[in-house]
Amino acid sequence: MLKADPECGIAYWGIALSLLLNPHVPTPAKNLAEGAAAIAKGKSVGAKTQRERDYIDALAIIYVDHDKVGHLPRTQGYAKAMEQVAQRYPNDDEAQIHYALSLNASASAADKTYANQLKGAAILEPIFARQPQHPGVAHYLIHLYDYPPIAEKGLNAARIYAKIAPDAAHAQHMPSHIFTRVGYWQESIDSNKVAQRVAKEASDLHDQLHAMDYQVYAYLQLGQDGKAKTLLDEMPSVTGFTETFLVGPYALAVSPARYAIERGDWKAAASLEVRPSPLSQVQAITYFARALGAARSGNPEAAKVDIAKLVELRDKLQGKDAYWSEQVDIQQKVTSAWVLHAEGKYDDALSAMSAAADAEDKTEKHPVTPGVPTPARELYGVMLLDRGKPTEALVAFEATLKKEPNRLRAYVGAAKAAEKSGDAAKAKEYYGKVVAIAANADTTRTDVADARAHLSR
């Protein structure tokens, strides 16, 4: 475009927009600097129409003071500006689409009414009905519905999107956001297998790792640990990506943590190596897994060392990224509760674990991940069960399943809690769920064998 018309202001807008990468994730500093220069150039050369100038001015807001102001406040400013553009041009579908996306990217993780998300979806659904092959609309609807209470609304867009763009890795991956939310594990695997292949062919390293992370998580929910391990062993061979962009580094940190935690291999979790990363929230994942593993292996002193690192990383994030600072704080709360448990301070441990679960329930998982390393509410159920409180544990496991359907460990916990609390009907139901979900699980999953044994009695 610029070769044909070096004075095309909207072309510079397009460059600046592309440099943001994923608006749900903080943009690397290098991209922000280049994007700010592009949008400034777009302003200086001018645009052909007032509409184009409005687009440029709105996007410019996300680049203002990018080296001083955090990602979320700038994104919220952009959303307000795009609202004005959308109102000014009500018949401009692209203005409506960009505004809808900005509503999701700027939403507060603490808002459980999902007001922004539902507003954005209400804008896009009529456009999707008119333009069912519009890739942006399908894509953004998936993001807008990527929340537990409203995820099923996104199934239509999820099933259509991959067919619209078969050669785009991200398009092949995105349906799995919804499949994960509703617990369709095999569908998530199938989606991400294609995404991984397409990303690898295109040398799209972040999308390749992202698809592998989602597959690891889904395989673990099916109890197919061997397939998860094969992917896990392959992931470190993917190199050369931008370390300051969250997607790739996050996948490399969280997948080994998941593999240990989901299998209850606490010694393996405690001995995980921390992969160097400039991103504090990425390092925190491994310190969390190490601390949890050490505490649950009966080594609270080792856990305390890793918890101290979590506190340090949380403090680094404070004032820079409120969302991730809070997530790391929750990780610190969870692991500290298990240290108390390991020290025999059971009442204090239960109180601390309950508070950690409450704190996590007030937030949302980030779009970069299929789920937190392990749900705090589920861990609270495990602790309650350990302390001989099966009725309360059952409530915790059922709450986990409401938020994260078809989680295997949550169903295992719910089945055991129901059995121990004397609820034979629920025990049978939940053991049946374990057997159904993990029908093709590896034989090393003893919980699945126990579930089959219970049902055969």
Residue ranges of model-derived segments:
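Amphipathic alpha-helical repeat scaffolds of TPR domains
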Residues: E7-L19, A47-K68, N91-A109, Q131-Y145, ...
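Solenoid-like repeat scaffolds
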Residues: M1-A4, A86-R88, F128-R130, R159-D167, ...
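TPR/TPR-like (Sel1-like) alpha-helical repeat modules
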Residues: A16, L20, K30-A47, D190-R197, ...
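Residue at a conserved register position within TPR or TPR-like alpha-solenoid repeats
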Residues: L19, I61, L103, L144-Y145, ...
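Inter-helical turn/loop elements of alpha-helical hairpins
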Residues: A4-D5, I15-T49, D57-P73, S106-A115, ...
